[in-house]
Amino acid sequence: LRPLPGAQSVETVCTGLDGLVERAADYYAQGARFAKWRAVLQITADGCPSDLAIRENAWGLARYARSVQESGLVPIIEPEILMDGDHSIEVTSAVQEQILKEVYFACQLNGVLLEGTLLKPSMTIQGADCAQKSDPQIVAEMTVRTLERCVPASVPGIVFLSGGLSEEAASVYLNNMNTILRKAQWNLGFSYGRALQHSCLKAWAGKDKEAGQAALLARAKANSEASQGRYVPGSQPSSDEQLFVAGYTY
C-alpha cells in the first residue's frame, strides 16, 4: 500500500500491477490457484473515502483480477473498509455500496469473468468508536442487504475478512447471515486472520503445540458451522477480546 497522490493523507492505493501477468503465470506453474489483492479504504469525518480513492482502488482491483485470470488464477477481490472511526452502521453501508458498485463496474470494463472470482469484503458494521453498537442480527441483515444491492449473482462466493472483530463476534455475525433468506445464492464463508488465529497463538505461545492446535481446530469448527448457519454461540472455545487496533497496517 502506498499513499495516493491527490487524495487525503490517510488514503492509499495498492501497487504492483506491472509484470503481474508474468508473475501470476509463474505462481500458477508452481502450484498456486488463487491470488489476493487488498485495497484499503477508511471512513472519516472530513470526507474519506474520496471519489478518487474509491475509483483508483476499484480500478486496481479490477486490473489485478483480469491480470491473474489471464494466467489461470482465481482472484480474491478484497475492498476492505477499516473499522477506525465513530461512524454509524448506516454510514458504513452507504459507503460500502458506493465502493462495491465501483468495483464491479471496473470489473465489467476490464472483462473480468465474475464466475471465476471471490469477493472478500468487510462486514457492514459501525466504526469502532461509535457509541451505538449494533446487535449481531442487525449487522447480519445490513451486511446481506448491502451485498444484495451491489454484488452480482454470478459471483459464486463471498469470504469475509474479520477486520478486528473478536473471534466470537466474527463467528456469530457470519452464522446469522447464513440464516437469512437471500436473493442471490452466493456461498458466504470466511477468510479470517486474527479472528481465526488469536486463541491459537495465545495457547501455543511458542511452546505448547497441542494447545495451539486444539484452539485452532475449535475456531475452524466454529466458523465452518457458521458458514452453514449451524453455529451455536459459545459452543466452541473462543475469545471475546476485541482484536481491533486503531491505525493497524500490514
Tell where the protein language model's regions lie, with residue ranges.
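Glycine-rich, proline-tolerant flexible connector loops at the mouths of alpha/beta enzymes
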Residues: 6-8, 39-53, 81-87, 128
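Glycine-rich anion/phosphate-binding loops
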Residues: 8-25, 49-64, 97-98
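Residues at alpha-helix termini
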Residues: 29, 67-70, 109, 149
